[in-house]
């Protein structure tokens, strides 16, 4: 059975192995054992309540319980930019006009921005390529919203997600070549790694403080502004079906889009509800425990021992019927409450 749970120290080796499969462009999961160990400790301290909001970050793992192996990760930063500045480019417009010459021209620009300071961020989503099936991707992504819904008080009024921008098969970023290289004089992979390991001072020191004219960039760089890496397209689609939208902010390194939404307007947060657990063995006559029913995200309400699974069922009343195996995976007993929501919006066919 596949289940999502909070990260534990014993997961370090599996996460390090996953980090080796990400490729260039995923700044939040570098293959650096010391950094990953510190990231795990920060998550554990977040759950223990010993960190300020600007330092808090939750890290979840997708575990194949049969193989006893972590095969995916996803995370939430509680409030970005409160300790270290949060940078992106805002895609804007400057107007150049002259009545004397009868000239009026609007010019697209890139402004260095800290506009998302204090927002909660969805990040560090990565699934082992061998497990990119059976709805594991949407499960690992959307379970974060179910956690936010259950513990809404810990998160901001807005949620954002930086999407990995376009790089070619050699890891080359056209946006970086046309923008970042001129200010940093280092390779994209190096800047990407430094940022991912928390060494971000160089961004503030070297990035331009004045708007950049998009028309001055190479054509291939202009073409990838707001575009995602092909491998990231499914993750973007998942978030967009939940209500997140591109509002004209892009990553300063690769030009990838930032998606955002009001937290309370995200479908999973808005539509999730609570049910009381009833435990019974599967019966072919049982309408509720049905392999052909709608697919649902189900999670317990335990903050420190959060667990979530996918299950097919029909909701007929305020109770949720679970098999003993599902109840054990969730860590719940009869009479406990769980939070549930359909994995996909009712009008979305999957």
From Swiss-Prot:
Pathway: Amino-acid degradation; L-arginine degradation via AST pathway; L-glutamate and succinate from L-arginine: step 1/5. Keywords: Acyltransferase, Arginine metabolism, Transferase. It comes from the Bacteria. One of its GO terms (biological process) is arginine catabolic process. Gene3D superfamilies: 2.40.40.20. The active site is at residue 229. GO terms for molecular function: arginine N-succinyltransferase activity; N-succinylarginine dihydrolase activity. It is an enzyme of class 2 (transferase). It catalyses: succinyl-CoA + L-arginine = N(2)-succinyl-L-arginine + CoA + H(+). Succinyl-CoA binds at residue 125. Catalyzes the transfer of succinyl-CoA to arginine to produce N(2)-succinylarginine. PANTHER family: ARGININE N-SUCCINYLTRANSFERASE, N-SUCCINYLARGININE DIHYDROLASE. Belongs to the arginine N-succinyltransferase family. This is Arginine N-succinyltransferase. It comes from Yersinia pestis. The gene is astA.
């Amino acid at each position: 059975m596949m289940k999502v749970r909070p990260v534990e120290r014993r997961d370090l080796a599996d996460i390090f192995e996953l980090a080796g499969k990400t490729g260039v462009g995923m700044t939040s999961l570098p293959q650096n054992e010391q950094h990953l160990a510190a990231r795990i400790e920060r998550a554990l301290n977040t759950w223990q309540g010993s960190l300020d909001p600007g330092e808090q970050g939750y890290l979840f793992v997708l575990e194949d319980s049969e193989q006893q192996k972590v095969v995916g990760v996803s995370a939430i930063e509680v409030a970005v930019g409160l300790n270290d500045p949060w940078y992106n480019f805002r895609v804007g417009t400057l107007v150049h006009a002259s009545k004397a010459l009868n000239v009026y021209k609007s010019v697209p620009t890139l402004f260095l921005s800290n506009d998302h300071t204090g927002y909660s961020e969805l990040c560090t989503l990565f699934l082992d390529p061998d497990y990119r099936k059976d709805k594991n991707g949407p499960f690992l992504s959307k379970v974060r919203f179910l956690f936010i819904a259950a513990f809404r008080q810990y998160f901001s009024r807005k949620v954002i997600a930086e999407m990995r921008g376009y790089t070619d098969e050699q890891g080359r970023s056209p946006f970086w070549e046309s923008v970042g290289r001129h200010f940093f004089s280092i390779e994209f992979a190096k800047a990407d790694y430094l940022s991912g390991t928390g060494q971000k001072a160089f961004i503030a020191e070297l990035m331009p403080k004045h708007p950049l004219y998009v028309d001055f960039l190479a054509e291939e760089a202009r073409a990838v502004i707001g575009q995602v890496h092909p491998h990231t397209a499914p993750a973007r689609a998942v978030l967009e079906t939940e209500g997140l939208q591109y509002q004209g902010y892009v990553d300063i390194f690769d030009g990838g889009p930032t998606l955002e939404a009001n937290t309370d307007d995200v479908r999973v947060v808005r539509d999730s509800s609570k049910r009381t657990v009833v435990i019974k063995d599967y019966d072919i006559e049982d309408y509720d425990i049905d392999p052909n029913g709608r697919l649902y995200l189900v999670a317990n309400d335990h903050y420190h021992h959060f667990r979530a699974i996918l299950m097919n069922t029909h909701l007929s009343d305020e109770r949720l019927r679970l098999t003993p195996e599902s109840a054990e995976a969730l860590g719940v007993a009869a009479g406990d409450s769980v939070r549930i929501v359909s994995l996909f919006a009712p009008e979305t066919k999957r």
